[in-house]
A protein has these predicted regions:
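Short amphipathic alpha-helices in soluble, non-transmembrane regions
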Residues: 74-84, 120-132, 187-188
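Short, charge-patterned binding micro-sites
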Residues: 36-66, 97-99
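Ordered, amphipathic secondary-structure segments that act as subunit-interaction surfaces
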Residues: 60-111
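Short beta-strand-to-loop capping motifs
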Residues: 6-8, 65-71, 110-116, 173-177
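Ordered, soluble secondary-structure elements with a strong preference for glycine-centered loop motifs
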Residues: 14-18, 70, 74, 120, ...
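Core RNA-modification/binding signature centered on pseudouridine synthases
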Residues: 131-219
Length: 219
């Protein structure tokens, strides 16, 4: 299995996961790169993204899996970048070795923005919130009859750094990636719930790295 490491930025942040898959399938065709297809009466290009990115997030560490058939891997980035839309950039193509189950953590940078500047005491309030022994929030769940389930966020947060930067507060978060994973939007929701005086006007999300259990880059 081969992997494409790519970035997603600017207007490409708003491409949904399904549309992103279709975009890559079309771009392989335009680039003249043959990849493995599914078998059957309606074969289609086999591509997958192990950790789909939420709409509106930027990322410098996305990974797409495929099987390149007859193109040297070192040629793939240049040819794909000529075919992909603006905001999506393939950095490299390589032979995947690590199984997806070893993708353990995700590093996010969440920027909390305030139109009138960060409120006094917001940084310490948020730091205190993320230092609690327990932080329970409701999240959507298809399995629950009510459509929601309570989850304690603290066991899913491996590391959290809070830093005020002029009119913003930056959260450097390392969160569980899967089984279960934690969406950083839940942390922003927790700030709005438990620290309303520190609630941002809006938040900007960036995925910076995908990591293994030892906090090393997963590839």
């Amino acid at each position: 299995m081969h992997r494409l490491a790519f970035t997603k930025a600017d207007t490409a942040k708003f491409i949904s996961h399904l549309d992103l898959m279709r975009t890559f399938q079309r771009s392989f065709l335009r680039a003249g790169i043959h990849i493995k297809h599914t078998e059957g009466f309606n074969p289609h290009a086999f591509v997958s993204i192990p950790l789909p990115l939420s709409v509106g997030y930027s990322s410098s560490c996305e990974v797409l899996e495929c099987q390149v058939l007859d193109t040297p891997l070192e040629e793939v980035p240049q040819r794909m970048n000529a075919a992909l839309p603006a905001g999506i950039t393939v950095q490299r193509c390589y032979e995947g070795v690590r199984p997806v189950k070893e993708l353990y953590y995700v590093n996010y940078i969440v920027t909390l923005e305030y139109e009138a500047g960060a409120p006094f005491g917001a940084e310490s309030a948020i730091r205190g919130l993320l230092s609690r022994d327990s932080l329970v929030m409701e999240k959507k769940s298809k399995k629950a009859k009510s459509g929601k389930v309570e989850v304690d966020l603290i066991p899913l947060i491996a590391k959290a750094t809070v830093e005020e930067r002029r009119d913003t507060i930056a959260l450097d978060l390392i969160l569980k990636a899967q089984n279960p994973g934690l969406n950083p939007e839940l942390i922003v929701s927790a700030i709005r719930t438990y620290c309303p005086d520190a609630a941002p006007d809006y938040a900007v999300f960036h995925r910076r790295a995908v990591l293994d259990e030892r906090f090393q880059n997963w590839e």
